[in-house]
C-alpha cells in the first residue's frame, strides 16, 4: 500500500500529482534517460538491473525494455545480474557499467577515488557515454529508492515502450 495517496498497485506516475512541478521535471528526466541515452541497450539495462537489485525495488527489477530483444537483451542478461563480475555472457563494457552502477549505489566516494577503475573505463567509454551512465544511475538510484520507500508500484511489471 502506498505511503502517500491511495494509488493502485500498478500506478507508477499518479503520485507525481502530489508534487506536479517536481514530478513533471522528474518525468522529463526519466524520459530523456530512456529515449536519448547513447549507451548500448545491453550496457544500459545491465547497469539499471544492478541498481534495481541494490534498491530492492520490485518494479525496477521486473522492468523490461520493449526494444531489448532486438538489441540482444534477453532474460539471460537479467538472470545473471548478480554475477556481473564473472558471467562470460557480459562484455567488458557491460561489466564496467555494472561495476559503476554497483559502486555508485553503495560506495560512491570510493569509486570517485579509484584510479584503476577510471583507467579501465577510459578504454571502453567516452566521456559522453560516462556522462550518460552517471546521469542514468542517478535516476535509477533515486527513483528506485523513492518507489520502494513509498511502496509505489511494487506489485507490477513495467515495459519501457519502443522508441522505433
Please provide the spans of the model-predicted regions.
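Short acidic alpha-helix initiation/capping motifs at coil-to-helix transition points
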Residues: 21-27, 56-60, 107-115
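Secretory/periplasmic and organellar redox-cofactor proteins
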Residues: 1-18, 115-130, 136-164
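Mobile cap/lid helix-loop segments that border enzyme active or cofactor-binding sites
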Residues: 1-45, 65-69, 164
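Short alpha-helical scaffolding segments that buttress acidic/His motifs in well-ordered protein cores
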Residues: 46-51, 81-82, 97-105, 133-144
